Amino acid sequence: MSPQTETKAGVGFKAGVKDYRLTYYTPEYKTKDTDILAAFRMTPQPGVPAEEAGAAVAAESSTGTWTTVWTDGLTSLDRYKGRCYDIEPVAGEENQYIAYVAYPLDLFEEGSVTNMLTSIVGNVFGFKALRALRLEDLRIPPAYSKTFLGPPHGIQVERDKLNKYGRPLLGCTIKPKLGLSAKNYGRAVYECLRGGLDFTKDDENVNSQPFMRWRDRFLFVAEALFKSQAETGEIKGHYLNATAGTCEEMMKRAVFARELGAPIVMHDYLTGGFTANTSLAFYCRDNGLLLHIHRAMHAVIDRQKNHGIHFRVLAKALRMSGGDHIHAGTVVGKLEGEREVTLGFVDLLRDDYIEKDRSRGIYFTQDWVSMPGVFPVASGGIHVWHMPALTEIFGDDSVLQFGGGTLGHPWGNAPGAVANRVALEACVQARNEGRDLAREGNEIIREASKWSPELAAACEIWKAIKFEFETIDTL
């Protein structure tokens, strides 16, 4: 044995596979205000103790590897390691636990959602000791959140820009999502905005395809914006999707939108990536553009109940990366969303301070300090009969987006927009008068339809439309 080996062995080095519990399971640890805290729902493989599984999660998402290495002695692992500080069984589930892990702040690059997620979820989800793993929540300490600029503008600044207060904003996704020419697309935008909507929207997969190149779409949409503004006296917007194959092309599209005088652009933040999203948010902040965020691909990540990342984590990450709107489900309609859980992450998007509330899926108290809030967007299979519930559930600081619920009106696009605007104004007025939207919603819509033929036609065509499916995508 060489002298070097003898010296290293003499101070406790021992090669071989690690027992993670010895180093990374620390139930006596008191969390610090500066720690990033994570709640993982874990399902260990048969025969793997929960403590070993929780410690493995902490190790593999911080300083650990599968064996002891010589270079461990060149740093202070105790300073930099993640710690599994608590484990609790999940009620009603066999062999499933919530593991709480604390990460020291120095593990993360300032202002980088990309680095934060790469560290916490980048590798550990493929660990063989775990049958399934889901990141349920993160606590972002103010010491870290203050290194992010967050939304380009936020809720209050957007309302001031639009001069619209005291009600939810109304939007519409142009359909069919693919296949329209730029001129016909612009025509649909104009008709919807003229009818009373605040926004129209590119669908998430509208980029720059052969049937409609992005520059042509931007030009015809800008014409529709200015014409509808002149006729209605209201500020209008269309979410021009700047998402592209490269960051350089994305920025070129955003610059062109600003030069046209458009008030808002859009990005698919999960498929486009957090680095691209943060770069676009910086540009929007510096140049007075609002930024609408679509969550395309989110269900691939968040829909399984036992494996993946819960959307509340993706929502927090978006608030840090930057966006003024983000799609957040509906509770009603065709897209999945449980009411209390949905309202939990809606509050995490909008509010400055959110208390821990396990009944709503909020595992940690979150203090955003002064970071601006994000408008939650409700969309997907909604129509005028849903308006009372949406107004009551989401409140004023939200965007209610009706695609088929506008363009599917039997009289055309503009009457569809009129029907939605009348229904919204009726619900807001009824609420302000003290009426119960949850109990009297249908009656409020029927009363309004008596003096709005557009709303009456919408009520008739969608009176029997419901989306009632049980969630079956569980492990």
UniProtKB/Swiss-Prot annotation:
Q: How is the cofactor bound?
A: Binds 1 Mg(2+) ion per subunit.
Species whose genome carries this gene: Adiantum capillus-veneris (Maidenhair fern)
Could you tell me what this protein does?
RuBisCO catalyzes two reactions: the carboxylation of D-ribulose 1,5-bisphosphate, the primary event in carbon dioxide fixation, as well as the oxidative fragmentation of the pentose substrate in the photorespiration process. Both reactions occur simultaneously and in competition at the same active site.
Write down what this protein is called.
Ribulose bisphosphate carboxylase large chain
What Gene Ontology terms describe where this protein resides (cellular component)? chloroplast
Q: What is its EC number?
A: 4.1.1.39
Site description Transition state stabilizer, residues in chain? 334
Positions contributing to substrate binding: 123, 173, 177, 295, 327, 379
Q: Which residues carry this modification: N6-carboxylysine?
A: 201
Q: Which cofactor does it need?
A: Mg(2+)
Instruction: Cite the source lineage.
Output: Eukaryota, Viridiplantae, Streptophyta, Embryophyta, Tracheophyta
